[in-house]
């Protein structure tokens, strides 16, 4: 008597699920180009602002350029803040943590104190230019008299918040970019903290931008695959 053995067909193996981080390379690439675009726009913009920025403004001076500079400035401030965030948000270490924390004070202080104060001063000078000669002279005497404590506070607060953020970011990227980019960024940050008009402004932001560019080149080179040896036939 023959026995017929029936074998069940093996069930097809379930398809492997896509890894949770499958979209991560695309997201990383998008963030990379956003970071570069933010830095490029802000650095070039601040360089131009520094070159054309009047050293001082007095009654009788043209105010359109001065006011326009300080109206545009908050855009570059926020782009720098966003660029720094994208640069250090995933980096470990105390310096990266300090840079992340310092972003908000920098954005608030530099925007509200420096940019808004510049617009306000330009508006005062414009009103004085439209007033009588006697009133204009009175405004100028008020601007020249005494110590500008408000201006000193704005200058110090703006410079310190920028330097804290940018210098901490420069230290944080040393482990991925090396000493060269860190030095350029740190020196540029220190010079730019003195002020954004010429000469410290353009020089400082240019050095900081060169450090960022050097860092990006090193990061790009680190991502490039190693060349595979070709076997001779």
Go through the PLM ranges and name each one:
Residues 1-30:
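Short, Lys/Arg-rich, polar N-terminal cytosolic tail immediately upstream
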Residues 8-17, 221-233:
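A short, highly charged, low-complexity intrinsically disordered segment
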Residues 23-230:
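Hydrophobic, aromatic-enriched alpha-helical segments typical of multi-pass transmembrane helices
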